[in-house]
Amino acid sequence: MSAEQEKKTQGTTKEEQKSSFASEDVASKQTEEAKAVFGDGVAKQENKSGASTNDEKKPAEGDEDAEPASPEVHFEPIVKLSAVETKTNEEEETVEFKMRAKLFRFDKAASEWKERGTGDARLLKHKETGKTRLVMRRDKTLKVCANHLLMPEMKLTPNVGSDRSWVWTVAADVSEGEPTAETFAIRFANSENANLFKENFEKYQEENAKILKKN
């Protein structure tokens, strides 16, 4: 290579270096201007790789699961309800007799006996009038399945083929609200209980007959 060509080559190299340094100065100047206007975050986004830097803020562990503590809230009722006393219409009566039994009702339409309920058959005597009625409630639900006065015309008759059950007819049973004529059959655990029921039934039936006769 001649001396003249070497000079040309060296001149070209110096020009390229100047151009490169000038480009770097321009880029640096633009970065500084961006920092001044938008802050350091914008300048970082102008990195050639475009990747996020390690200086980016990371969420603290457990922040997503953390819940702000709330104080316990207590609400007072706007309207205070007073206790309501439930009445059974038996408050003015005394229990003269009680025996567990199962009650049946004769369904005329189907011409068959249907179970009415299981519970305590009770003879309740009113404190003022002195009249006695038969009241029986179903277990658990306490729904009334028999409710009528022991009238003089009623007659207990043995159920066919059983020594522990009785059958009788009622002109006005009010267990369903409205008075209805019913035929009942009541069955006890044994004949002794059945006979005790019959004795007390007829005893208070006679007392009712005397009271009704006076009236």
Curated annotation (Swiss-Prot):
Record bears the keyword Phosphoprotein: yes
Entry keyword annotation includes Cytoplasm: yes
Biased segments, Basic and acidic residues type: 1-18, 26-35
Gene Ontology MF: a single term: GTP binding
Family annotation (Pfam families): Ran_BP1
Localization, UniProt: Cytoplasm
Region span, Disordered: 1-78
GO cellular component annotations of the record: cytoplasm; cytosol; nuclear pore
Residues found modified as Phosphoserine: 70
InterPro entries the record matches: PH-like_dom_sf, Ran_bind_dom, RanBP1-like, RanBP1_RanBD
Gene3D superfamilies (UniProt xref): Pleckstrin-homology domain (PH domain)/Phosphotyrosine-binding domain (PTB)
Ranges where the RanBD1 domain occurs: 74-210
Biological function: Stimulates the GTPase activity in the presence of RNA1. May potentiate the action of RanGAP1 (RNA1), thus playing the role of a negative regulator.
Protein family: Belongs to the RANBP1 family.
UniProt protein name: Ran-specific GTPase-activating protein 1
Organism: Schizosaccharomyces pombe (strain 972 / ATCC 24843) (Fission yeast)
